């Protein structure tokens, strides 16, 4: 486990009490995260902790089709309901290392520092993705704030420095990027097959799509005005312009 990110239980306890000198997390701010989107469909996702935060994490994993397993002796009503309807598997006991077997991603959402450290250390030994909620020293990945509209997802992260600031930025981004952006993404996806089959190089395909997105008239403004037909005409015109000339 990275020494710069984790210096033992004392460091974690100080961090949670707000008296940490921050040396244990400074490296996280100085080293940029590798941003990626994970495909969770059908993958086992472990959540340890049955409180409201655990419920929030479970709902996020379910929204991405993860196969969620909850480990907790007790759970809030929302989690109980998800287990009762079969949406999640609920193991009603304290965490054990074997719970990580065949697991893709683990999230610890308990208020017990010892359990959180055990989950982190056990997952690190398995080279597994693990996040202990609100304790950056016990994370090898962090969960950004997400603005999601249809296929459009925008992630906002402060590298764990300030979740509150990330949420403020999320609200501002959500106001700026509305449903018209998601609709344009869907419309552009409809011609991806044509582009791959017709335009011979990556640079050709890049120029085709950028010509639509950044062209005039602005497709976003057209969609804001409800003129989807005009956007389809823009796309059709770009197809004619970029298609290779017949031999």
Model feature map: region roles:
Residues 13, 18-74, 79-82:
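Hydrophobic, well-ordered beta-alpha structural blocks that scaffold small-molecule cofactor pockets
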Residues 52-53, 114, 160:
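Residue-level detector of alpha-helix initiation sites
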Residues 105-111, 116-143:
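ADP-ribose/adenylate-binding Rossmann-like module
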């Amino acid at each position: 486990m990275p020494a710069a990110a984790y210096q033992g239980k004392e460091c974690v306890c100080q961090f949670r009490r707000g008296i940490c000198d921050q040396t244990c997390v400074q490296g996280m701010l100085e080293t940029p995260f590798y941003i990626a989107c994970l495909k969770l469909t059908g993958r086992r996702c472990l959540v340890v902790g049955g409180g409201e935060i655990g419920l929030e994490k479970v709902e996020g994993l379910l929204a991405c089709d993860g196969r969620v397993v909850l480990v907790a002796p007790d759970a809030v009503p929302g989690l109980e309901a998800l287990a009762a309807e079969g949406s999640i598997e609920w193991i009603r006991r304290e965490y054990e290392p074997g719970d990580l077997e065949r697991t893709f991603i683990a999230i610890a959402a308990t208020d017990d520092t010892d359990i959180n450290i055990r989950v982190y250390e056990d997952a690190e030994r398995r080279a597994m993705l693990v996040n202990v909620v609100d304790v950056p020293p016990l994370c090898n990945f962090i969960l950004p704030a997400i603005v999601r509209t249809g296929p459009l997802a925008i992630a906002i992260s402060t590298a764990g420095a300030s979740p509150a600031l990330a949420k403020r930025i999320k609200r501002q981004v959500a106001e700026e990027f509305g449903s018209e952006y998601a609709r344009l993404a869907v419309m552009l996806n409809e011609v991806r097959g044509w582009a791959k089959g017709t335009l011979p190089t990556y640079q050709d395909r890049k120029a085709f799509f950028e010509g639509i997105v950044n062209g005039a008239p602005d497709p976003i403004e057209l969609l804001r005005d409800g003129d989807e037909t005009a956007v389809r005409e823009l796309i059709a015109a770009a197809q004619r312009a970029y298609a290779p000339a017949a031999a």
